[in-house]
Each structure stands twice: as C-alpha cells, then as structure tokens.
UniProtKB/Swiss-Prot annotation:
Keyword set, alphabetical order: Membrane, Transmembrane, Transmembrane helix
Gene behind the chain: cnih2
Subcellular location: Membrane
PROSITE patterns in alphabetical order: CORNICHON (PS01340)
Transmembrane segments: 11-31, 73-93, 139-161
Protein name: Protein cornichon homolog 2
CC per GO annotation: membrane
Gene Ontology process terms (BP): vesicle-mediated transport
Domain of life, per lineage: Eukaryota
SMART domains: Cornichon (SM01398)
C-alpha cells in the first residue's frame, strides 16, 4: 500500500473538516441562543436583565468572531493542498466556498478590524436569519465534503496500491 501526497492531503483534510464541522455547529448553537434570547417576551421589560443580555450578546459575538478567521484559513489550506496535489475535481468543489469566504472577508464593515458579527447588527432579525441560514448551508457543505474526503482517502490509497 503506497502513501501519496494526495492521500496525505485527504487524510489531513478529513481531520480539519471535522474541526470545521464543530466550528459551524457552535455557530448554529450561538445563533439559536441569540434568537431565543431575542424572542423571550417575559424578560424584555426587565431593566436589570437588559444589561446582562447585552453582555451575553457581546460575549457570543466575540466568540463567533474568533472562529471566523481560522475557518477561512483552514478552508484556504484545503484549496492550496488540493491544488498542489493536482486534485482538480476536489479543488473545483471547494473553490465556490473559498470565493464566498474571500468576498465575505473583504466586504466586512469598514469601521473596524472586526470581520463580522457586530453585537448591534446581529440582533437585527434579518441579519440573524441570514447568519443562521449561512451556518446551516456551511454545515451541509462540510458534512458532504467530509464524506467525500473519506471516500477519496480510500479511493486514492486503493488506486495507488493496485
């Protein structure tokens, strides 16, 4: 059984894709928590709870921002590895999300160095819905990619050993 650079790329990508799946699951949970906190009508009029809610939203947004750049870098590493390994089909499947990540990064708010997830704007229902849909779409993409990479690890090793 031979071990090629392409097989190594798929194995490393498989492990890193699992971490991206956990990142996105955390995003989904955080958005759901923001949505639940936003819709709780009992505590809307409680001024003592308002300060705590604002701190909670700021904390969640800060944690979300810390996961954005690593996610973009890991996915960029996927594309770079597949380009070096000459895995053109896999690279072609990953390029659209890479371009979306680049577009999202370069169209971040101009007023600061933060990538996205501003505590004030995230509580807008439309933005929160958009972020949640984006997270679900990324989860679907990363799950499908995970199983594709798993298949390609086996196919790459089997192809080389034959």
């Amino acid at each position: 059984m031979a071990f090629t650079f392409a097989a190594f790329c798929y194995m490393l990508t498989l492990v890193l894709c699992a971490s991206l799946i956990f990142f996105i699951i955390w995003h989904i949970i955080a958005f759901d928590e923001l949505r639940t906190d936003f819709k709780n009508p009992i505590e809307q009029g409680n001024p003592s709870r308002a300060r705590e809610r604002v701190k909670n939203v700021e904390r969640i947004c800060c944690l979300l921002r810390k996961l954005v750049v690593p996610e973009y870098c890991i996915h960029g590493l996927f594309c770079l590895m597949f380009m070096c390994a000459a895995e053109w089909v896999t690279l072609g499947l990953n390029i659209p999300l890479l371009f979306y990540h680049l577009w999202r990064y370069f169209h971040r708010p101009a007023d600061g160095s933060e990538v996205m997830f501003d505590p004030v704007s995230i509580m807008n229902v439309d933005i929160l819905n958009y972020c949640q849909k984006e997270a679900w779409c990324k989860l679907a993409f990363y799950l499908l990619s995970f199983f594709y990479y798993l298949y390609r690890v086996g196919a790459t090793v089997r192809y080389v050993s034959a």
